[in-house]
């Protein structure tokens, strides 16, 4: 069975950015060896891989404003949010959400991945790399 980070295409990365990591993911992060993990935008210049956890649309809007300048053009960008079916977490992000904060920066959703019963992630790529 593939690990979370194999599913997220964490291949050949030497450094990654993980923002707003919720409880329950520290063990999976600890499994990553020989990879520098940054958990603050202050620590980074331009990243090739980012996994950002947000709970609602407002958090996403605020985070993308500061995150976008820190991403390389062909970044592997995943935005994780609570699943609508989660029994523990609430969110206003649904399948009908238009992802406007990302689309205005020319990021398009390309894949959806169930992380666990409470979280799912959407991968985005810049339109010019599709």
Locate the predicted segments by residue.
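Core SAM-dependent methyltransferase catalytic element
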Residues: 121-130
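Short, glycine-rich nucleotide/cofactor-binding loops
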Residues: 50-60
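N-terminal, charge-rich interaction modules
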Residues: 1-29
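Conserved acidic residues
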Residues: 14, 47-48
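Mid-chain, well-packed structural core segment of small domains
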Residues: 61-93
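C-terminal substrate-binding/active-site "lid" region of AdoMet-derived donor-dependent transferases
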Residues: 80-120
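Mature catalytic domains of secreted/periplasmic carbohydrate-active enzymes
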Residues: 32-33
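Short acidic low-complexity segments
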Residues: 36-47
């Amino acid at each position: 069975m593939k690990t979370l980070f194999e599913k997220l295409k964490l291949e050949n990365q030497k450094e990654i950015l993980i923002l707003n990591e919720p409880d329950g993911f520290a063990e999976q992060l600890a499994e990553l060896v020989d990879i520098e993990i940054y958990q603050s935008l202050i620590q980074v210049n331009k990243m090739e891989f980012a996994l950002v956890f947000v709970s609602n649309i407002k958090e996403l809007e605020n985070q993308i404003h500061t995150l976008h300048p820190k991403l390389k053009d062909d970044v592997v960008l995943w935005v994780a949010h609570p699943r609508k079916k989660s029994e523990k977490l609430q969110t206003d992000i649904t399948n009908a959400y238009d992802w406007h904060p990302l689309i205005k920066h020319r990021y398009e959703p390309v894949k959806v991945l169930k992380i666990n019963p409470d979280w799912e992630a959407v991968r985005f790529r810049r339109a010019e790399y599709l």
